C-alpha cells in the first residue's frame, strides 16, 4: 500500500501545550556570538591553577553531554514521537544542544585558555571514566528505543529528563558558584541562558513521558517507576564519584553533592514522580547565581535582562563581495 504523507498543520493544535513550548523556545533563542566574554579575562587570570582546571573540566563535561543530547538523544526521541509539531519542538531543542550550548562552551574556552589547554581538556573528556560512563549509560537507553514501542520511548524520555534536569547540574554548579559572587559574569550569563533552555527541555519531555505513563496499567506503572529509580540510582552513584574526581581539588565536592540531589528531585518532579532524596539546604551562593538581579530564572520569561541581542541589519549587495583567496570576487 502506498504511504500517504501529511503536512504539519500549525493552524491546528496537536495538544494543549506543544505550541506554547514552541513559542517559548523561540522567545528564548540566542546565539553564543551575541555574548561578549572578554570581561572575564581579568578574573580568570587571578584564579588558582586548580580553580581553572576544575572550571575547564566541568565545561568540557557539559560539552560532551550537550553533544550527545543534540546528536543522539533528542533526534531519536523526536523520530519516535507522533505529531509534526512535537517533532519540530524536539528538533529545535536538539539544535540548541549542540549548535548553541556546546558551541558556547567552546567560545568560553577560546576566550580564556590557550589552544594547548583546550586540547588537553578535550582529551580528558575521552579518558575520564565517570564522564564516559555517564554518557554511555544515557545513550544506551536511547539506543533501545524501538518503533511503535511506547515503553522503550518512555524509558528514553526518562533518560533525557535525567540528563537535562539532573546530570547537567554537577557541571553548572561551578560557573554558578562564581556568578553568585559576581565573578566570571559573562560566562555565568551564558550558563544561565543554557540552564533556562534545559529547564524547558526537561519539563516538555517530562510531559510527553507522563502521557505514556498515565496510559499504562497500575502494574506496568509500578514497573516503570522502579526502572526509573534504578536508573536514577545508577547515575547518582556515578555522579558522586565524578563530583569527587572534579571538585575535590577545590574543596567543594560535599556542596556539589547536595546540589545534584536537589536537581535529581527536580528531574523526578518533571516526570510526575515524588522526591526521592531528602530536602537539604543548597549553597546560597549558587542559588544566588540562579537569581541574580540581571536574571529572572523562570523558563516562561524571555531572554534575561543581561542578554544583549545583536543588531540585525538588512543585507546589501556588498555583503556578498568576498576578498579572501578562493572566494568569488
Curated annotation (Swiss-Prot):
Domain of life: Bacteria
GO molecular function: metal ion binding; ribonucleoside-diphosphate reductase activity, thioredoxin disulfide as acceptor
InterPro entries: Ferritin-like_SF, RNR-like, RNR_NrdF-like, RNR_small, RNR_small_AS, RNR_small_fam
CDD domains noted in UniProt: RNRR2
Pfam families xref list: Ribonuc_red_sm (PF00268)
Reactions it catalyzes: a 2'-deoxyribonucleoside 5'-diphosphate + [thioredoxin]-disulfide + H2O = a ribonucleoside 5'-diphosphate + [thioredoxin]-dithiol
Alphabetic keyword roster: Deoxyribonucleotide synthesis, Iron, Metal-binding, Oxidoreductase
Any GO CC annotation of this UniProt entry: ribonucleoside-diphosphate reductase complex
Manner of cofactor binding, per the entry note: Binds 2 iron ions per subunit.
Family the entry assigns: Belongs to the ribonucleoside diphosphate reductase small chain family.
Miscellaneous notes: This gene has an intron within which is encoded YosQ, a putative homing endonuclease.
Function comment: Provides the precursors necessary for DNA synthesis. Catalyzes the biosynthesis of deoxyribonucleotides from the corresponding ribonucleotides.
Protein name as catalogued: SPbeta prophage-derived ribonucleoside-diphosphate reductase subunit beta
Organism: Bacillus subtilis (strain 168)
Gene designation per UniProt: yosP
